[in-house]
C-alpha cells in the first residue's frame, strides 16, 4: 500500500503543478513549450509537415496530448496531412476547399463533443418551468461547485460547470463531488429537509471569483479557439486551481449556501390516480419529443 501511494504521488504531483503555469503564471509554461517544439523538430524532418503540425498558440491553450507515436505516424510515406477544410462529401470521396478531390473508403468524423449544450439539459426543468438548456443558453453554463444550479431545487449532478481539468485526472474531481453530494443527501435526510436550492447570490459570487481567476489563464489568453470557452466568451468548463483546493471546498455540504424548506412545511401533493399519472407522463414525453 505504501508503494502504491508513492507511485500515485509521483504521477499526481508533476501533473498537478502544471496548473501554476496554466492558470496562475503563464510564463512558467515557456520551458514546457520549448521542449514540445524541440520534440516536433526532432520527430518531423519535412519542413512543410512540421509547419502544419506546429501550433500557433501557447501550449496548454488546448488540451495537451502525450504520445510517442503520433508524429511518426504522420511522417509515414503512406500518410498525407491535409489541413484544408472539407467543402463537399461525394459518393466516393471528399472535395477540399482548394478544389482537390480525394477518393476515400471511409470517413472518420472527429468533431468533438457537446459540453455547454448537452442534449440532456433540455429534459431538466427548474421551478419556473425553464429548462436547464434555456438557462445555460441565456447566461452561460454556471453552477455552484459544479453540483447545483440556482432555480433547480433538489438537483445535484457530477462534472458540472467549471469542474473540468486541463492538466490532470478528472477522477479526483469526481470523487470530491461524490463526497459533497453524498453529504448533501445525508444532511437533507438528517434535518428532514424537503427542498434545497443554492442561493442565486451565492452562485453569482462563486462564478465571479472563478471568472476572475480564469482571466489570466492560458486557456483564456493563449490565442486559440477551444471548447473551453462558450459563446459568451466565458470559460465555463475548467477549474482554475489545484484539485486539492476543490476537494477542500467540497469536503462537506454547506447548507448555509442554500435555501431550504422543511419537509413538514411543504404543501401536500394531491393524490393522483394511475390514469392521471399516465396522462402526465405522456404529456411530459410529448414536451421532450417536441424539443
Model-derived features: where do they sit?
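N-terminal FAD-binding dinucleotide-binding subdomain shared by FAD-dependent oxidases/monooxygenases
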Residues: 1-291
Amino acid at each position: 500500500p505504501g508503494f502504491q501511494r508513492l507511485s500515485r504521488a509521483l504521477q499526481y504531483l508533476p501533473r498537478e503543478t502544471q496548473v501554476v503555469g496554466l492558470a496562475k503564471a503563464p510564463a512558467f509554461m515557456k520551458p514546457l513549450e520549448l521542449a514540445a517544439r524541440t520534440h516536433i523538430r526532432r520527430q518531423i524532418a519535412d519542413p512543410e509537415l512540421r509547419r502544419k503540425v506546429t501550433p500557433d498558440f501557447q501550449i496548454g491553450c488546448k488540451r495537451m496530448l502525450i504520445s510517442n507515436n503520433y508524429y511518426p505516424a504522420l511522417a509515414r510515406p503512406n500518410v498525407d496531412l491535409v489541413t484544408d477544410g472539407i467543402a463537399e462529401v461525394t459518393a466516393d470521396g471528399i472535395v477540399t476547399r482548394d478544389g482537390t478531390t480525394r477518393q476515400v473508403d471511409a470517413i472518420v468524423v472527429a468533431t468533438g463533443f457537446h459540453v455547454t449544450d448537452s442534449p440532456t439539459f433540455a429534459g431538466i426543468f427548474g421551478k419556473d418551468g425553464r429548462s436547464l438548456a434555456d438557462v445555460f443558453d441565456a447566461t452561460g453554463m454556471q453552477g455552484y461547485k459544479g453540483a447545483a444550479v440556482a432555480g433547480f431545487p433538489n438537483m445535484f449532478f457530477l462534472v458540472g460547470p467549471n469542474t473540468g481539468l486541463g492538466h490532470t485526472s478528472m477522477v479526483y474531481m469526481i470523487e470530491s463531488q461524490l463526497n459533497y453530494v453524498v453529504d448533501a443527501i445525508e444532511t437533507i435526510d438528517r434535518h428532514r429537509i424537503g427542498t434545497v436550492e443554492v442561493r442565486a447570490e451565492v452562485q453569482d459570487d462563486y462564478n465571479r471569483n472563478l471568472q476572475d481567476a480564469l482571466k489570466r489563464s492560458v486557456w483564456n489568453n493563449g490565442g486559440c479557439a477551444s471548447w473551453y470557452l462558450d459563446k459568451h466568451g466565458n470559460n465555463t468548463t475548467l477549474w482554475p486551481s489545484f484539485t486539492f483546493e476543490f476537494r477542500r471546498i467540497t469536503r462537506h455540504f454547506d447548507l448555509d449556501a442554500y435555501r431550504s424548506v422543511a419537509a413538514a412545511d411543504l404543501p401536500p401533493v394531491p393524490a393522483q390516480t394511475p390514469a392521471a399519472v399516465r396522462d402526465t407522463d405522456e404529456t411530459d414525453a410529448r414536451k421532450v419529443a417536441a424539443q
